[in-house]
Amino acid sequence: MVYSRLRPLLLMASVPFLVVLPACKPGSAGDKAEAAAKADSKEKRYPLTGEIIKGDLERSTLLVKHDEIPGYMMAMTMEFAVTVGDVANAQSGQRIRAELVEREDGELALEKIWAIDTTADAQVGSASGALRQDTSIRGRRAYREVGENLPDFALYDQTGKVVSPAKFRGKQVMINFIFTRCPVATMCPLATANMTSTQRKAKEAGVNDIEFISITLDPEFDTPGVLRTYAQQRGIDTTNFSFLTGPESAIKDLLTQFGVIAEFKGSILQHTVSTLLIDTTGKIIWRADGSQWSPDEFVGKMKKSST
């Protein structure tokens, strides 16, 4: 994948700070160039549903018994290229929905893979509806200040399991927002590096009541499998580090309540960077805007909160 040049952007949120940050774009030379590339691409894409037969982690493939794809292919069992995270998440007999991609070289791949789980989907959907209502009721006061409680939500982690704040009750939580395709070294990549550094330093300092959460800014692309691949490629210890994704509406409401700006302008994702620390009672106790914060500073706050 080819990544982008930087474009400066002046952003002001409905929160008490003003920031200047670059935009992140998964493309090479602007909207016109990307549109032309898509027009010239010979890739074909189709929605797909089916049942996983088995995964091959070494070859990074899934064998799927898929349903008929109208106008393209009858129902059959086929092997598809996928991410290593998707293979790791795969369970034999699991129903999935995905996007089938016929690449220019003829290879067939699956992207945007989601498990079809009515129970989990209902749980996430219900929580997302409640979050939407809460954000709407709060109106102009939707932004949560330091001292307010963490909003309730439910999202999927990098393994596809449903995660809500209840899972972390009695623990401190450090939260930030990233997306896996972000090419700007001083933004998401630095934010992730700082989070993993904080995780390591917290462990060394004996802070054991801490969980780390990175919520995607790009839920359409960042499926559980993509997030798991992202974590694995960086050697991140996920025993207390969750990467979350879910409905776009829920992500937008969380961004609003946390005072984070993220908006696609064409293919460009313009966003700010913020990191928050939540105490064991669910209260926001610290916030750092931008990506130049110190892991040692957060660990110090954690140690103080633990005592």
Regions found by a protein language model. Name each.
Residues 84-97:
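Short nucleic-acid-contacting surface segments enriched for D/E, G, S/T with interspersed K/R
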Residues 92, 115, 119-165, 193:
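N-terminal "domain-start" segment that seeds a small globular fold
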Residues 164-194:
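Short active-site neighborhood of thiol/selenol oxidoreductases, capturing the structured segment around
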Residues 20-23:
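C-terminal motif of bacterial Sec signal peptides marking the signal peptidase cleavage site
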Residues 25-27:
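Bacterial signal peptide processing site
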Residues 261, 265-307:
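Thiol-/selenol-based redox modules, centered on thioredoxin-like
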Residues 58-67:
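Short aromatic-glycine-enriched beta-strand elements
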